[in-house]
Regions:
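Bacterial N-terminal signal peptides
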Residues: 5-14
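Bacterial Sec-dependent signal peptides at the C-terminal "C-region" and cleavage site
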Residues: 14-24
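Gly/Pro-enriched, hydrophobic low-complexity segments
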Residues: 20, 165, 169-266
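N-terminal mature ectodomain segment of secretory-pathway/periplasmic proteins
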Residues: 22-23, 27-126, 159-161
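Short, solvent-exposed aromatic-acidic interface loops
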Residues: 92-97, 124-125, 202-206, 237-243, ...
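Acidic/charged, solvent-exposed loop-and-adjacent secondary-structure segments enriched in E/D, K/R, S/T
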Residues: 119-146
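Short, conserved active-site entrance elements at the starts or edges of catalytic domains
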Residues: 137-177, 198-201
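Gram-negative outer-membrane assembly/targeting C-terminal domains
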Residues: 264-276
Length: 276
């Protein structure tokens, strides 16, 4: 009961203080508070990140697969001035059945997203991923709230607009729409108590039948990953209201000495036929 009253009090106080703000001013304030809660400069100056843990895929709300996962992310310098739609990240994703499969020196099945292209790399060579998969990666990245806060703030034409406050999972939240020059919008729920992102939601088109897809993500169990930088250790992804993926992280390390070659194809690697 005390927790509920505290939540109601926070929600009420946020409403009183917000009456003098425009929706744009309130949206900017909420986003600025989120950046500060994520670590401020520790978050904004994050050069790279390595997330390890377990992932569970689901179909019809039932677990359909499990793997151990090591996800490497490195950020590229932002253009000055910022460019709309700039994809400033390279990603290496290694998965396996057991922890030793994702040890760096033993990784023999990885996915690379680098310089606008994607590849599945195995002992046979590098197979370019289909245009649809690469485009889905780009869409997911540009709509990810952590990428937006790290790489897209200040982008020309980016509009941050508050939709007010509400409750989500019995906690008071601030809801903000972030819209770019392509009129693509991400709706983000920020926890009023912690100021951290709790949920995000956006829509995209199915590349096969052009139907509208709702993509939602939930973020929980934030921890300090170094220097005051915060990161969620539980991430759930839903599509059209159904759970499709859950990630349970066991460790997150930032600002490591990751070689650039980790995110590029070896010069002598055989290039296989592209996926359809």
């Amino acid at each position: 009961m005390r927790t509920l009253w505290a939540a109601l009090l926070v929600a009420g106080m946020a409403g009183w203080g917000a009456r003098a703000e425009t929706s744009l001013q309130r949206g900017k304030r909420v986003v600025d508070e989120a950046v500060a809660a994520l670590g401020g400069q520790a978050f904004l100056n994050m050069r790279n990140r390595v997330e390890t843990g377990r992932i569970f895929s689901s179909y019809n709300d039932k677990v359909s697969g499990m793997a151990v996962d090591a996800l490497y992310t490195t950020y590229l310098p932002r253009p000055d001035p910022p460019e709309p739609g700039f994809l400033g990240v390279r990603v290496r994703d290694a998965r396996g059945r057991k922890p030793e499969d994702i040890v760096l020196k033993k990784q023999d099945d990885i996915i690379l997203y680098t310089d606008g292209a994607g590849y599945e790399v195995t002992f046979r060579g590098a197979r370019p991923l289909s245009d649809a998969i690469v485009n889905q990666f780009k869409i997911a990245t540009l709509h990810n709230i952590f990428y937006i806060l790290r790489q897209r703030l200040g982008e020309p034409g980016l509009v941050i607009d508050s939709r007010g406050s509400d409750f989500f999972d019995n906690r008071p939240v601030e809801i903000v729409d972030i819209t770019d020059t392509n009129n693509d919008t991400v709706t983000v729920y920020f926890d009023q108590m912690t100021k951290l992102p709790a949920r995000q939601l956006y829509y995209r088109r199915d590349p096969i039948d052009n139907s509208k897809l709702e993509e939602a993500s939930l973020f929980n169990k934030y921890r300090d990953v170094g220097g005051g930088g915060m990161w969620p250790f539980t991430i759930r992804s839903d599509r059209n209201g159904e759970k499709v993926l859950e990630r349970y992280l066991e460790s997150v390390e930032i600002n490591l000495d990751l070689k650039d070659s980790m995110f590029r194809l070896a010069p002598d690697l055989k290039i296989l036929k592209k996926e359809k």
